[in-house]
Amino acid sequence: MQPPPRHPPIVAKVEQAATQLTAPLTALFAFAVCVIIINLTAAQPLTGPVSRSLHLPVSLSGLVAMLPQLGYAVGMLFLVPLADLLENRRLTVTTLACCALMLALAASAATAPWFLLAVCLAGATSCAIQILVPLAAAMAHPDRRGSAVGNVMSGVMLGILLSRPFASLIEGAFGWRAFYGVLAALDALLALALWRWLPLRHPGSGETYRGLIASLGTLWRREKVLRRYAYSAAVVMAGFSAFWTGIGLRLVQAPFSLDSHGMALFALAGVAGTIVAPLAGKIGDRGHSATAMPVAHLLLLIGVLLAGSAGAGWFGMPIAEHPQLALGLLVIAAILLDAGAVGDQTLGRRAINMLDPNARSRLNGLFVGVFFVGGGIGAVAAGTAWAIAGWGGVCALCLALCALAFVGDLLARARH
């Protein structure tokens, strides 16, 4: 008897690729996106060390964290649509190998321009995440698609939450070049693993590259579900980014006065919120997304109210007299905010991946691009809110954004 082929054939039509997603492959997808997302979100604690080492002026130091994000946006627009045109395994592995090369260049860069170019291109090629997520959705059975997307999305959120403490610890022990070297090695090993274990997937769109790019506007106008969930995700991501931008400023102040290790532990505590992703996916698969989404946004509202109480003294809480209690409440607030954001993301992703299967990568790209913009706006707005009113101002901003998402749920239910 001949042994089965290592890569089972998967035909062109995406929906016929269902039932191919096994538990080990799901774990591989989740691990892959967890590693890749670190390329984008770990730069903030490295801004100071990199700027000093490469003699980057203070006025330009923000480029260290901004350019990977800008590159990612470019990759979303020009590289991700290729997943609806080219064989997905080869595209993913090639993109990730280029990312590893760019990270290695960043680790060895002798001047600031070379470093900034390298991290920008590393950000662009990190869009491999948005090839992997719709690929996992395409491989999953339609009845379990939400659960599959939730499991993979838990990897994304885990990577986001781990990236800053991971970067801080490695930079503190070995320097920033070692951190980028470790990332390059991880991405290279990951590319080899994906080449070995990912199945082939030939998309069936039949479009040209120019046609794919031109179709983005048409898809946005045509798909009401995409617009609904993308707007919701953008608002939620703005609140999520505002919280995590401001909390670092608050925790170094009295009565908390946390050092870098304390900040890392606080960030790790928020990882508990990622367990919501598989649960949210299963709820969506059972047809309860319309109920689950307001619950996710309600968790966000409760988390923000706790954060305002424990960090800004809302509702008369005596923070100075009970600093340990206040810190514990801030941890709970972080977990609730992470859980709400993960739930929103997972339910939105599931809905998007139930739309046109031949445009799945483009739909995911549009969805992510919109909420990515929301996250950037939230981070910038948090800085302004902090300058005006401190942590209380940041929490007020988060509360307004989360309330907007919740009101959107109520309006959507009223229309139906």
Where would I find each of the regions flagged by the language model?
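Structural signature of the two symmetry-related core transmembrane helices
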Residues: R90-A104, A184, T291-L306, L399
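Helix-loop-helix hairpin linking two adjacent transmembrane segments in secondary transporters
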Residues: N151-L198
